[in-house]
Structures are given as structure tokens and as C-alpha cells.
Amino acid sequence: MASASPSSSRRLTKEYSDLREHPIPDIRVNLVDDNLFHWACTALGPSDSVYAGGKFHFSLKFPLDYPFQPPTIEFTTRIYHPNFDSEGNVCLAILKQQVFKPSIKLRSVLEQILQLLREPNPDDPLVASIAEQYRNDRPSFDKIARDYVEQFAKS
């Protein structure tokens, strides 16, 4: 079985320590079983969004050659959003293989997740039908998104 490079471990240790010492408001990060390569995260729905009052749990998993490959994100809290699918996948531009660079910090990734909660990006959706509804029938989108928060994101 392959093992992580010392530079991957150092980088993750540094980024994790930075996020614990200087947390991003409304984001919590913890290691899963003391594993630097698997984080459990929680994002609080921004107060100025349809996701206000929700707690959204997700995991960050890092490849052994991080930061040369992007982490994967899996949302475990169901969310009605054009950039998140029902399997927990997230469409985040900076994590796409052709865009991701080693210079991208995890702080930026987490801040962009909060930004997606604040303002969905219907131009780069994972769920085209929700993106279409967001563009063309915003009141219905907002109602369903709020209903999902009440039903799935209040714990």
C-alpha cells in the first residue's frame, strides 16, 4: 500500500493547524480518527441565504500526493442546491482537475463552499434542473431549499 509523502503530511498539518488557530467563521474542521487525510467539517448556512439556520456536514479526503491532486468533498447533509447532487458531490471550480494547483489553500476551498451556500452558481451546476429552477423560478427554489434545511440540516 502506498504511503503519503512527508511533504503531504507537513502541508496538511500546517493547514489544519492554521484553520484551528484562525478559524473561518461558520466553518468547523476536525480530523476523523486522528487521520490528517480525512477531515470532518461543518458549515453553518449563511444568515443572508436560504440555507440560514442549517448545519451542513461534509468530509474532506486528501489523496496521498496532496497538494498535487485536489481533495474530494462529500456532503453528508442533504441539500437542495444546483452545485450539490444527491450523492454528496460538490461542483467547485477550484477543485476541478484542470484548475487545481498546489498553491490553492484549504482555507480558500472552505471559503468557496460558504460562498456557494450564500450564492449558488447556476452556470456550473451538478444538477441542471435545479439550476434552471434557480434561474427561472426563484421563489420555488427558495421554498424547496428552505424546506430541505428544515428537514435535513437542523441537527
Curated annotation (Swiss-Prot):
Taxonomic path: Eukaryota, Fungi, Dikarya, Ascomycota, Taphrinomycotina
Residues annotated as domain UBC core: 7-154
Gene name of this polypeptide: ubc14
PANTHER family: UBIQUITIN-CONJUGATING ENZYME E2 (PTHR24067)
Residues of the active site: C91
Annotated metabolic or biological route of this protein: Protein modification; protein ubiquitination
Catalytic activity: S-ubiquitinyl-[E1 ubiquitin-activating enzyme]-L-cysteine + [E2 ubiquitin-conjugating enzyme]-L-cysteine = [E1 ubiquitin-activating enzyme]-L-cysteine + S-ubiquitinyl-[E2 ubiquitin-conjugating enzyme]-L-cysteine
Sorted UniProt keywords: ATP-binding, Nucleotide-binding, Transferase, Ubl conjugation pathway
This protein's name: Ubiquitin-conjugating enzyme E2 14
Protein family according to the UniProt entry: Belongs to the ubiquitin-conjugating enzyme family.
A single GO molecular function term of this UniProt record: ATP binding
Naturally occurring in which organism (per UniProt): Schizosaccharomyces pombe (strain 972 / ATCC 24843) (Fission yeast)
InterPro entries given in the database record: Ub_conjugating_enzyme, UBQ-conjugat_E2_core, UBQ-conjugating_enzyme/RWD
Enzyme class: transferase
Function summary: Catalyzes the covalent attachment of ubiquitin to other proteins. Mediates the selective degradation of short-lived and abnormal proteins.
